[in-house]
């Protein structure tokens, strides 16, 4: 993968490195797996956040460029800029998601994923559909070279066809060597060009139409070769 972007909104800093960004992504996704494996029914959301921070610290990822978030149950409906309701305990049949943004050396990581416990089929479908929608949007980006605004309109329509509502309060954002916010603070959903690979985080947050729960998935926009088919939902990813 080569660095070819010339759009001013897609500038990077002096420490940007393709290999570095991919390594930060790899370490961030491993941390997601490590944290999710330690979350069990009966755990308080605040305790899960503290545990997640400790896992990141133990993994050499003690610096983060946005708060470490764990959302349980009804808190999965909330936009990231809204604080969780306190005192939420993970139930035996429940849904939760993680949103972490560690820095590895000079490079920003960012990943989010939804998990379920128990056997609630609706929760399981929501978690699966968030990831599937990500890959459908990513696939149409790669095939049709849509703008950021067009990608989120496609995501909105597709989410509704799945029976969910897309939360556009999570509209995607830049990523690069730290700090990307010093370069560009605009949203992917407002970007009027086709996004370049390794410049943007595509955020997908879908909500139950009745507002009871939601699911979240995010990753860098990258070409299909960067994704393992064995970990993809049933979606067209080429």
Q: What residue ranges belong to the model's regions?
A:
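Active-site neighborhoods and metal-handling regions in enzymes and metal-associated proteins
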Residues: 1-238
């Amino acid at each position: 993968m080569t660095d070819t972007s010339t759009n001013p909104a897609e500038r990077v800093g002096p420490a940007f490195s393709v290999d570095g960004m991919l390594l930060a992504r790899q370490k961030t996704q491993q941390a997601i797996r490590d944290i999710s494996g330690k979350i069990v029914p009966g755990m308080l959301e605040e305790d899960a956040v503290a545990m997640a921070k400790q896992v990141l610290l133990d993994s050499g990822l003690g610096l983060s460029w946005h708060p470490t978030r764990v959302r349980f149950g009804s808190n999965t409906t909330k936009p990231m800029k809204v604080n969780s309701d306190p005192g939420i305990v993970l139930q035996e049949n429940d849904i939760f998601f993680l949103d972490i943004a560690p820095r590895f050396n000079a490079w920003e990581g960012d990943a989010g994923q939804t998990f379920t416990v128990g056997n609630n089929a609706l929760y399981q479908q929501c978690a699966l559909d968030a990831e599937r929608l990500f890959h459908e949007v990513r696939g149409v980006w790669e095939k049709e070279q849509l703008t950021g605004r067009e990608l989120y309109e496609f995501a909105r329509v597709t989410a509704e066809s799945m029976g969910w509502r897309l939360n556009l309060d999570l509209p995607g954002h830049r990523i690069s060597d730290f700090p990307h916010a010093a370069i560009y603070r605009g949203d992917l959903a407002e970007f009027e060009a086709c996004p370049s690979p390794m410049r943007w985080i595509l955020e997908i947050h879908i909500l139950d139409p009745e507002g009871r729960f939601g699911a979240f998935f995010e990753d860098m926009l990258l070409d299909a070769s960067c994704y393992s088919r064995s970990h993809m939902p049933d979606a067209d990813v080429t």
